[in-house]
């Protein structure tokens, strides 16, 4: 299972993350630097939400232009705490990214799901080119991640969980059979990386079998 840490400019933390084999999650609302890491590209909606600002379309498009082609995947714009209404925004951007950004044609696009979503809402979109980003509240993520991971596998798609900052939640991700997760704890506090990475490396038999069967 792949761990992504929020991009940081702190050299000590970057060195620790690199040594542990983690990757970076680069936000469209942050510095567009990869620090030489493999990376994924986040749409920046969470940062806008935290600042009580509207979604920054210009920042997202700039990030896609500069970093999209090299990303492991791109998180399609969503509405934080928007419920199923978020899917309308995501579908709009999903179509735009697929048909107007030729340079990212090989990069998987991840649709963010959250409280209020049901598999039937997104299953027509899923494929090896379109995966699932599990957002929403912590409780909802923990209750539903196994279902979303199984759905993604059935469509040959990636399943990623956002904002995972404890060893317990990393173990839940592993048991659910997801492909990757991201969090900010290891970026901000190098001392937390070791327990988080130990949890990442602990293979859960059910999760391992599920991923191998995909």
Kindly give the residue locations of the regions a language model identified:
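Glycine-enriched alpha-helix->loop->beta-strand junction motifs that scaffold or abut catalytic
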Residues: 19-23, 36-37, 70-71, 107, ...
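Glycine-rich adenosine-cofactor-binding loop
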Residues: 130, 135, 141-170
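Conserved, mostly hydrophobic/aromatic
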Residues: 42, 111, 173
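Catalytic cores of alpha/beta
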Residues: 54-62, 120-125, 159, 165-183
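Glycine-rich phosphate-binding active-site loops on the catalytic face of alpha/beta enzymes
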Residues: 137-138, 174-204
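Alpha/beta enzyme core
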Residues: 66-69, 96, 100-104, 116-132
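Distinct, well-ordered alpha-helical segments
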Residues: 87-92, 117-127, 144-148
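Non-catalytic, usually N-terminal nucleic-acid engagement modules in DNA/RNA processing proteins
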Residues: 1-98, 210-213
